[in-house]
């Protein structure tokens, strides 16, 4: 091979490598400033936006017409991600996704909501919006704009274009069953050639498979520079919801499921470092099964030490099971239409399915009754030093305040 050909070969390989680096970088950066600037690009102020209805079509501005066109045009090109081999994708309906979005009933959704339920949601959303606007409550990421959120931090926002819904899932807050509901609604997973109709029939391993859901972090690869604009179109039109839980009880639940049971992944990634750093164990078994047989388990105190250690997040962000809700769901950047709570799960689930107008189509799966109870807090924290409890509250204070959970005074004083 001549020197000229060799030079050209290296030039081509170098160019391909640089292009791959650019793609990887922008996928992480989130294309923060590469989108069309229309009416949806401007920040929204004032009262929450009303649910779009038939009368709103007459009020659309020229910019809104562009938004509507782009929404339909881009939605029409949506291709489902690859799913597990035994589960084939649902073929697009005639007319593609555009028909699904265009044919959706955008009429007001709260006709069957009782006055008490309406007041409760209004109070929860008012508390959330109030503290997002209140300068007295400060926490990381509070002041940043939606455009500044990296794509990697948008992976918890699941989109259902068929019913106009966006769900931000929070681990340890009934997210497995809500993911099942989203799979049924979106028809994103087939079993023997037909979409699942019963949420409980969906195998757990498919529920948590990222390829079973369309999430915001996938938009950049599909739509490039238009991804942020399309996200804003959907955030304005769709019903956005999340479910939360008392932050300390959520931590206890995460500890119970990940460290009190044999979990090989969490043992290797988290338990081994915790046991070495906070329990002074230098020689540890290779597997969780061996460790459990030898009586080597992470204590709740070790777990709290790990959370409070300033070096923990210098190595990597908190795992999603104990990461703060404000970091998972960005409630000060996204105006949620419905805030559900695990403490009122049954009532809230029924109300939300009515709001989405799918209550005749499916029921929310019955909840697991061996749930970590808030009454256990004092027992779990009894051996945790007061100073640690106070530091832990500061770490999760934003979640307590934003979602209306009372400060656990009994745990924060002698």
Curated annotation (Swiss-Prot):
Topology feature Cytoplasmic, residues: 1-5
Q: Which residues lie on this side of the membrane: Lumenal?
A: 27-414
Q: What class of enzyme is it?
A: transferase
**Could you tell me where this protein is found in the cell?**
Golgi apparatus membrane
Q: Does the keyword section mention S-adenosyl-L-methionine?
A: no
Instruction: Please provide an example of a Pfam family that matches this protein in its UniProt record.
Output: Sulfotransfer_2
Mode of membrane association: Single-pass type II membrane protein
Q: In which tissues is it expressed?
A: Widely expressed. Expressed a high level in spinal chord, heart, spleen, thyroid, pituitary gland, adrenal gland, peripheral blood leukocytes, thymus, lung, small intestine, fetal kidney, fetal spleen and fetal lung.
Cellular component (GO) terms are:
Golgi membrane; membrane
Q: Would you indicate the residue range of the signal peptide?
A: none
Which residues does the annotation say bind 3'-phosphoadenylyl sulfate?
A: 171-177, 245-253
* The enzyme's E.C. designation: 2.8.2.5
The terms under GO molecular function for this entry are: 3'-phosphoadenosine 5'-phosphosulfate binding; chondroitin 4-sulfotransferase activity; sulfotransferase activity
Region: Disordered; residue ranges are 80-125
As for what it does, the entry says: Catalyzes the transfer of sulfate to position 4 of the N-acetylgalactosamine (GalNAc) residue of chondroitin and desulfated dermatan sulfate. Chondroitin sulfate constitutes the predominant proteoglycan present in cartilage and is distributed on the surfaces of many cells and extracellular matrices. Activity toward partially desulfated dermatan sulfate is however lower. Does not form 4, 6-di-O-sulfated GalNAc when chondroitin sulfate C is used as an acceptor.
Protein name (record): Carbohydrate sulfotransferase 12
A Gene Ontology BP annotation from the UniProt entry: chondroitin sulfate proteoglycan biosynthetic process
């Amino acid at each position: 091979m001549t020197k000229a050909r060799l030079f050209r070969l290296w030039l081509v390989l170098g160019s391909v490598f640089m292009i791959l680096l650019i793609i990887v970088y922008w996928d992480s950066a989130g294309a923060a400033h590469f989108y069309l600037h229309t009416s949806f690009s401007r920040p929204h102020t004032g009262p929450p936006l009303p649910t779009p209805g038939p009368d709103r079509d007459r009020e659309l501005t020229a910019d809104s017409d562009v938004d509507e066109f782009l929404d339909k045009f881009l939605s029409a090109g949506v291709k489902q991600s690859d799913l597990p081999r035994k589960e084939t994708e649902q073929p697009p309906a005639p007319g593609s996704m555009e028909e699904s979005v265009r044919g959706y009933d955008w009429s007001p959704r709260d006709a069957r909501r009782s006055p008490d339920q309406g007041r409760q949601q209004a109070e929860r959303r008012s508390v959330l919006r109030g503290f997002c606007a209140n300068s007295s409550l400060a926490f990381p990421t509070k002041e940043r704009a939606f455009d500044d959120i990296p794509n990697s931090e948008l992976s918890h926002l699941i989109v259902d274009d068929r019913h106009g819904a966006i769900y931000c899932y929070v681990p340890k807050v009934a997210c497995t069953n809500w993911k099942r509901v989203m799979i049924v609604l979106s028809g994103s997973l087939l079993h023997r050639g037909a979409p699942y109709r019963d949420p409980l029939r969906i195998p757990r391993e498919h529920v948590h498979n990222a390829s079973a859901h369309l999430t915001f972090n996938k938009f950049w690869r599909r739509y490039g520079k238009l991804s942020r604009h399309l996200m804003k179109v959907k955030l304005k039109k769709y019903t956005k919801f999340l479910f939360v839980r008392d932050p300390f009880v959520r931590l206890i639940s995460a500890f119970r499921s990940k460290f009190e049971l044999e979990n090989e992944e969490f043992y290797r990634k988290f338990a081994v470092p915790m046991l070495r750093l906070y329990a002074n164990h230098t020689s540890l078994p290779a597997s969780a099964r061996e460790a459990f047989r030898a009586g080597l388990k992470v204590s709740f105190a070790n777990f709290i030490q790990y959370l409070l250690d300033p070096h923990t997040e210098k190595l990597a962000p908190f795992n999603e099971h104990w990461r703060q809700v404000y970091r998972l769901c960005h409630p000060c950047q996204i105006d949620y239409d419905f805030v559900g709570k695990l403490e009122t799960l049954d009532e809230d689930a029924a109300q939300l399915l009515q709001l989405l107008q799918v209550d005749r189509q499916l029921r929310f799966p019955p909840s697991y009754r061996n749930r970590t109870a808030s009454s256990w807090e004092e027992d779990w924290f009894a051996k945790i030093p007061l100073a640690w409890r106070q530091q832990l509250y500061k770490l999760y204070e934003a979640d307590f305040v934003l979602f209306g959970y009372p400060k656990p005074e009994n745990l924060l004083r002698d």
